[in-house]
Regions:
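A cross-taxon signal for low-complexity, glycine/charged-rich
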Residues: 1-26
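Short active-site-proximal "capping" loops at secondary-structure junctions
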Residues: 83-85, 110-111
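ATP-dependent carboxylate-amine ligase catalytic core
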Residues: 32-34, 52-54, 58, 62-72, ...
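Short functional linear segments
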Residues: 2-6, 27-81, 88-90, 94-99, ...
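Intrinsically disordered, low-complexity sequence elements enriched in Ser/Thr/Gly/Pro
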Residues: 10, 24, 58, 83, ...
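Ubiquitous "structural anchor" signal
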Residues: 17, 26, 89-92, 112, ...
Length: 171
């Protein structure tokens, strides 16, 4: 089953529940924990949690980051711009890896599987590692609303810290 994008005519996978991120219900503010969810279950849940309006700013993410104690001791390389971000990140990962650095790479969006977004030392994150990171974030956030992307970014940082990377590259 897929949902058509009116603008592009492209199809995107619908969630198993049939809810797409746009128009999905908001989080009701009740703190619930969901142990035992698979990665697919977490991703579907994160799509439903996405607020209908995005609150600009970094305050919410900072509060959750602080609650988790995510203070990386390694350098962060942020690659931004319009074109070439993915290639630049891949080059940086390869160059730094060849120089003996243990790299963390976070990219978005993924092409086939969510796991592609988070890599440590060139290896995609496992479902179990992603689920563990999402569980930590969910427990720490309390009633703070986070977007799908913010959950993913915090999850990547948690994995990079736990994985002992020397440098992280963020697209």
């Amino acid at each position: 089953m897929s949902a058509k994008s009116k603008a592009s005519g492209l199809s995107r996978p619908a969630t198993a529940s049939g809810l797409a991120a746009k128009g999905a219900p908001r989080d009701d503010g009740i703190v619930q924990h969901f142990p035992g969810l698979s990665l697919t279950g977490w991703l579907e849940r994160l799509e439903r949690l996405h607020p209908s309006t995005i609150e600009l700013g970094l305050d919410r993410v900072r509060r959750v980051k602080d609650a988790l104690g995510l203070d990386p001791a390694f350098p962060l390389i942020v690659v931004g711009g319009t074109n070439g971000k993915g290639s630049t990140c891949a080059y940086l990962e390869a160059i730094l890896g060849a120089a003996g650095y243990k790299t963390g790479l976070y990219t978005s969006p993924h092409l086939l599987r969510y796991n592609e977004r988070v890599r440590i030392a060139g290896q995609e994150s496992t479902d179990a590692a992603l689920v563990q990171a999402f569980e930590k974030i969910d427990a720490a956030r309390g009633d703070i609303s986070l977007t799908y992307f913010e959950f993913g970014t915090l999850g990547a940082m948690a994995q990079f810290i736990d994985g002992g990377v020397d440098v992280a590259i963020l697209e």
